[in-house]
Amino acid sequence: MAKKTKKINVKLEKLNYISLKLTDVEFRYRENHPNAVDGVSFEINHGEYVTIIGHNGSGKSTISKIIIGVLRPQKGKIEVFGNEVHSSTITGIRKFLGIVFQNPDNQFIGSTVRDDIAFGLENRQIPQKKMQAIIEKAAAKVGMNNFLDHEPLMLSGGQKQRVAIASALALSPDIIIFDEATSMLDPKGRKEIKQIMVDLKESREKTIISITHDMDEILNSDKAIVMNKGQMVKCGKPHEVLYDEEFLKSIHLDVPFVSKVVDSLRLNGLKVKNTLNLRELVDEICQK
């Protein structure tokens, strides 16, 4: 009679307050192909809001898949709150993580918003009354508490993404990853989701990691990590990244030129002077 495989269920503790640490991480999709992630090292403290930016193919989305354990690097080390990520700890590690993807339509499986927010809680053996309280609290945090009995697919893009965020929040993760979470939304939807990200940042209760091309998200973050050809080529405060106009052009951001940056800021309610000098613009942004 074949032996049953014993399921490993490791409960992990926070060993330090470094939410995420990558050390010399390398990953390639196929043998003899160049590394999609090539010797990347960085650390993110708990409560920080960090953006990971770069053009398509730069390695930023590969990093997000490595963080959540979908991909395993060939070299290097990944730690979440001091716990090294490997096959025997990944189940425990994932309890620290929540992720919101680019297309909210791919995340709905229930017949109501309540069902979708509850997805993931069902395996946690939570009493029904407590589960409903968790669902309602998560929905209220993103302004969707009046939509709990609505059909998800009838919602707007911004509302769907808010439900996806509520679903992540219901699991009470310490780290939330937004993987291009605003890129498929209309301007109203983008504004709604970016405000939720800012609110989460201001609470400092969670670490926010956003894979993005969006200038507003970059400006709102505490730190920007810039990827190019699989390597981390710059890491610093947003204004440190934005000082270099040629650098912005080289990574093909959606709004790489100063005039477009000014327009983007004005559309989001920030009054800035006309200028073609990136340093002047960044200095002005940082004073506001």
Swiss-Prot record:
It is found in: Cell membrane. Its EC number is 7.-.-.-. Keywords: ATP-binding, Cell membrane, Membrane, Nucleotide-binding, Translocase, Transport. InterPro entries: AAA+_ATPase, ABC_transporter-like_ATP-bd, ABC_transporter-like_CS, ABC_transpr_CbiO/EcfA_su, ECF_ABC_transporter_ATP-bd, EcfA_1, P-loop_NTPase. ATP binds at residues 54-61. One of its GO terms (cellular component) is ATP-binding cassette (ABC) transporter complex. CDD domains: ABC_cobalt_CbiO_domain1. It comes from the Bacteria. This is Energy-coupling factor transporter ATP-binding protein EcfA1. It comes from Spiroplasma kunkelii. The gene is ecfA1.
